[in-house]
């Protein structure tokens, strides 16, 4: 099978990268489309074919002309529609050639299936769903579904125009599937395949749980600085712990730098000695460090299913999460983790205090159940096979 993965960036997220490798190892021809953002030397070993959108002006023009000529020879019946549609949506000639590259590359690869990873791509490059002669799958993820169309009515209407043209949808949680249904994604076309972790993660597993009665509770959150991640409420909860004389250290591991409002809040609450912010750790380093923490908290307002939570559960790190998005699909309160209401720093502080007083036998039972949840339902091998079934499904 010739599989195209339209990710927009190469390399892409860890889950998608692992999916590419598994597809290739099963003998499928895999093409990945995007702008190169990092090293991809391992693609060659795995026979993964990167289709890179060039940045250089001359390269952009040359590639666009090459693609147009290829399609004039092999797909003459469609090229005029494609070029007209591309031209209508462009601001200038450079933008026209750039859009040609981003739209036409999948058309020359004779794909059996094109899997678009981000919902906004079907709006920005609608030709991919209107004219391509193969099955089109769209992944429904995070803010593209839960936030963007809610605050942007124009985007919501465009989703309603283009979602009905998609053959199948992949949702990372049932909650996102229900939300996407508001914009024209029919429920009978949606397959729910949760994010997953590679089974190699268990080599970092620490069977000896970190004791909670140590001098200082070591807490961690993982995720970029963005209002939807709820860090302001997490810091308010830390301020409550500080006021009550509870010893703790809270680390935020983020892919971007601290925002001004968070920095102001840190200073205003005088939390500088209690909080550490780490930027730019690779996922491998994050996984290595996770077992050193007593507790992971997810204070988000919206999530599909958090990869950081999956990794923590696999590594037997207890998790307190807000009951947002699809998190209650993985966490069962007091069974394999803990759920609290969103936007409630008092409840978060209370749950942390309950955790501190909890017996080690109870914590052991929680992390045992969390680890088993991952082994039963959230391993990458299972999800890759489910994804291939969507690709092969003739309906």
Label for each model-derived stretch:
Residues 318-321:
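Short hydrophobic beta-strand element within catalytic cores of glycosyltransferases
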Residues 34, 138-141, 156-204:
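Donor nucleotide-sugar binding/catalytic pocket of nucleotide-sugar-dependent glycosyltransferases
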Residues 354, 361-377, 383-389:
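A short, well-ordered alpha-helix in the C-terminal region of glycosyltransferases
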Residues 333-334, 338-345, 354-360:
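Conserved acidic donor-binding segment of nucleotide-sugar-dependent glycosyltransferases
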Residues 222, 249-263, 279:
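Glycosyltransferase donor-sugar binding loop
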Residues 263-281:
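Nucleotide-activated donor-binding/catalytic signature segment of Leloir-type glycosyltransferases, i.e.
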Residues 14-18, 217, 224-240, 260, ...:
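A conserved mid-protein helix/loop that constitutes part of the nucleotide-sugar donor-binding site
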């Amino acid at each position: 099978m010739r599989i195209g993965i339209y990710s927009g960036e190469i390399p892409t997220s860890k889950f998608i990268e692992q999916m590419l490798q598994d597809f290739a190892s099963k003998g499928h021809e895999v093409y990945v489309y995007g702008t190169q953002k990092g090293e991809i030397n391992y693609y060659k070993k795995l026979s993964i074919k990167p289709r890179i959108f060039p940045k250089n002006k001359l390269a952009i023009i040359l590639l666009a002309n090459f693609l147009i000529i290829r399609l004039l020879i092999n797909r003459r019946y469609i090229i005029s529609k494609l070029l007209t549609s591309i031209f209508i949506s462009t601001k200038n000639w450079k933008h026209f050639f750039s859009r040609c590259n981003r739209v036409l590359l999948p058309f020359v690869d004779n794909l059996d299936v094109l899997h678009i990873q981000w919902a906004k791509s079907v709006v920005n490059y609608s030709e991919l769903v209107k004219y391509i002669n193969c099955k089109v799958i769209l992944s429904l993820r995070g803010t593209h579904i839960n936030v963007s169309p809610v605050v942007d009515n124009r985007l919501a209407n465009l989703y309603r125009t283009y979602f009905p043209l998609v053959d199948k949808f992949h949702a990372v949680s049932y909650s996102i599937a229900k939300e996407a249904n508001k914009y024209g994604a029919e429920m009978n076309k949606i397959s729910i395949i949760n994010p997953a972790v590679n089974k190699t993660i268990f080599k970092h597993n620490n069977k000896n749980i970190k004791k909670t009665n140590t001098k200082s509770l070591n807490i961690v959150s993982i995720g970029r600085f963005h209002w939807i991640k709820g860090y302001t409420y997490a810091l308010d909860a830390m301020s409550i712990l500080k006021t009550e004389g509870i010893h703790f250290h809270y680390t935020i591991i983020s892919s971007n730098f601290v925002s001004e409002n968070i920095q102001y809040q840190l200073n205003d609450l005088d939390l500088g000695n209690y909080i550490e912010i780490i930027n730019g750790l690779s996922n491998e380093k994050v996984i290595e460090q996770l077992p050193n923490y007593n507790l992971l908290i997810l204070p988000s307002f919206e999530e599909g299913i958090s990869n950081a939570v999956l990794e923590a559960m696999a590594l037997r790190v207890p998790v307190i999460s807000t009951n947002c998005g699809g998190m209650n699909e993985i966490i069962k309160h007091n069974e394999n983790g803990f759920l609290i209401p969103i936007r409630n720093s008092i409840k978060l502080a209370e749950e942390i205090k309950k955790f501190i007083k909890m017996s080690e036998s109870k914590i052991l039972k929680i992390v045992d159940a969390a680890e088993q949840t991952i082994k039963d339902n959230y391993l990458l091998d299972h999800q890759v096979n489910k994804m291939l079934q969507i690709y092969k499904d003739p309906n």
